[in-house]
């Protein structure tokens, strides 16, 4: 199956800002929701080009849908792909560093 080429702007969807993600930032790890078609190489290239940093490694997780219910209506959340990006020593993503 041939995979279509994603532009670097289409790889990263949004940063994940959770309590756990903020704790990981102290270890130079940043968490992003990424395009389901993206692989580790595309994520690394996108982060390096967009934020002008050097990436040490990328871990990717496929998040499964969770069951949800609202009254009698049942459904599931959507599935999505998460990337944990570890930066090399001395680099931070200034755009994501805010007061927390």
From Swiss-Prot:
Instruction: Please give the subunit comment from the record.
Output: Part of the 50S ribosomal subunit. Contacts protein L29, and trigger factor when it is bound to the ribosome.
SUPFAM superfamilies for this protein: Ribosomal proteins S24e, L23 and L15e (SSF54189)
Q: A Pfam family name for this chain? A: Ribosomal_L23
**Protein name listed in UniProt:** Large ribosomal subunit protein uL23
GO molecular function term, any single one? rRNA binding
What is the native source organism of this protein?
A: Thermotoga petrophila (strain ATCC BAA-488 / DSM 13995 / JCM 10881 / RKU-1)
Entry similarity comment? Belongs to the universal ribosomal protein uL23 family.
UniProt keyword list: Ribonucleoprotein, Ribosomal protein, RNA-binding, rRNA-binding
Q: What biological-process GO terms show up in the record?
A: translation
> Which cellular component terms (GO) are annotated to the entry?
ribonucleoprotein complex; ribosome
What is the role of the protein in this entry?
One of the early assembly proteins it binds 23S rRNA. One of the proteins that surrounds the polypeptide exit tunnel on the outside of the ribosome. Forms the main docking site for trigger factor binding to the ribosome.
